[in-house]
Structures are given as structure tokens and as C-alpha cells.
Amino acid sequence: LTISVMYFNEHLPISHEIEFWLGCVVALLMGALMGLAKMTLMSTLVIDTSESIMRTEANYISSWFGRVSLAIGAAIGLICSQFLDFRSTILVACAMGLCSIYFVRRAKFPFRAPEDYVSLYSTDRFFLLQGIPLFLLLAMVTMSAGLVVSTVINFEFFCFMFAGFVLSIISEKVVFSDADLKSEPITGLICMLLSLGMLLISQLPIVDKIIPVLFAFGVGIFATRFMLFLIKLSRHCQRGTSQSTYFLAWEFGLASGIALAYGVLNGVKTDIYLVALGLTVFVLLAYNFLLHPWYMSHRNR
């Protein structure tokens, strides 16, 4: 319903200023409602419909759908913008929302008795307070991703990003299955640094195909390991809270990166890539020398 407002927005008899603020309100509502739906699915329903021994695997799979959608959603959006007008693109988005409602209604969720007392405000299943250091570094990495994505208007780039995500899924099961905990985040950050460096200095056509694969590979394995770190940092009955914290870091970072690219850096690609590079270098140093030792001494699982 919120997205459908944009369908009529450009035909309303209102001034450009009111139209701008209406767009801001729609974006705010869309983010809040999408966040509510996704947090409920990831932190409650996915967990409640899984056996206790399979809940980490269920969280792992559901989080990957969120990462892969970064490439698939952007690619579909670019296709729609090339072959359809703006209003038709909005209709496609509404149709996808209806499909989501259909699939959620098809799932069978177990009945749970309500609690005797429900507080008005609570951080339960919202934010894992002991996971703030992980939240901050993950948000910085996804901010780098948001910065890079903001410069892309190429369908091919997102196709190669999807390939990079697939490679990271395979590598987690084959290469990193018995590797040291530190290896995945470090490898992911190094891959991100290499791709950002190539964005800044290389003009070769073949590099344009390597960069999105390498960048998505790095973001994928880093985010996956941090999602598992948050689970292991949580205490009893805080698994859902850890997933909400992960989701909040992922979406906050992406949105902040895109806002920074257009609102502060004015879309200048060189400046955007330099900021993304600086953020990634900072995360690499902070994780290697500060966060990993802290995590090893504070994890609960």
C-alpha cells in the first residue's frame, strides 16, 4: 500500500515541495514496514518453524536471501527502468509485495500462547546490546557496499555481483568449512580492498567484470561470518535479537552509504570509492587488532 502511493504521486495537484516531503514520508513508512516484516520473518518465524538443531542453518539461509536480493533486486529494477515507465515499475514492485504476502500465508506457523505481560518498550528481539562492536563494523562494511552500488547503472554489474555471492556461498562450504574463524572476515575485507583499488586505478574492460565478482564475494563472506558471530555472542533466548541486530546493521549501512554518496559526496565516483576504501581499511585494522580478540573472550556459544 505504501509503495502504491508513489504510483499516484506525480499526478497529485500539489507543489514540488509538498511532493518532496510526501516522498520522504513514503520512504520512511516503506522502510519501517519492510523492516517490521523482515525482522518478524528472520528473528521470529524462521526460528519458530525450525528444529532447535537446524536454527543456525535456517538463519544462515534466510540471511543469504537478503544478500542475494541486493544484486537481483537492483538488476530487476534496471530492467524495468529500461523497458517500462516509472508507474509501471511501481506496479511491478507492488506485484512482488503481493507475491510475498501469498507465500507467507502459505507457510504454517505453530501456535504460541501470548505472554502474561507485554511491556510497551523492549529491546528484546530488537537490538543485541552486547553486539554493538559487531554492529558498527558490519554497518561500515555495508556502508561501503552502499557507496559502490550508488555509482552503478549497469545491469551487467549486478549480474556479476550475483555470481560473486554464489562463489562466496560455495567457498563457505568448501574452502572455509574448517578454517580459522578469523580467515573469512579477513579474506572478505582483502577482496573488497582489491576491488575498490581496481575501481580507482584500472580502466581495462576485463576488470569491469572482475570487480563486482570480487566485491560481492568479499561482502558475502564477511557478512555471513558476522551474522554467525552475533548468534554466538547472544545469550539464551536471544537468537532472534541477534538476527534483528544483523538485519538492522545491514540495512542501516546500505542506506547510509547511498545517502552519503548522493547527499554529501554529490555522486563523484572518485570521492565515493576513496571513502569506501577508507572505511574498509579501518574495518580491517579494527577487526584484526581489536574486535576479534574481544569477540573470542565474550562469545557465549
Segments predicted by a language model, with ranges:
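Symmetry-related core transmembrane helices of the 12-TM Major Facilitator Superfamily/SLC fold
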Residues: 87-106, 271-294
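Hydrophobic core of transmembrane alpha-helices in multi-pass small-molecule transporters
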Residues: 16-37, 206-223
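C-terminal transmembrane helical hairpin of 12-TM major facilitator-type secondary transporters
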Residues: 182-226
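Glycine-rich segments within core transmembrane alpha-helices of 12-TM secondary carriers
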Residues: 54-78, 247-259
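Transmembrane alpha-helices of Major Facilitator/SLC transporters
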Residues: 156-184, 188-192
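Intracellular juxtamembrane helix-capping segments at the cytosolic ends
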Residues: 36-50, 220-235
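Cytoplasmic helix-loop-helix junction between adjacent transmembrane helices
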Residues: 26-64
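A late C-terminal transmembrane helix in Major Facilitator Superfamily
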Residues: 234-269
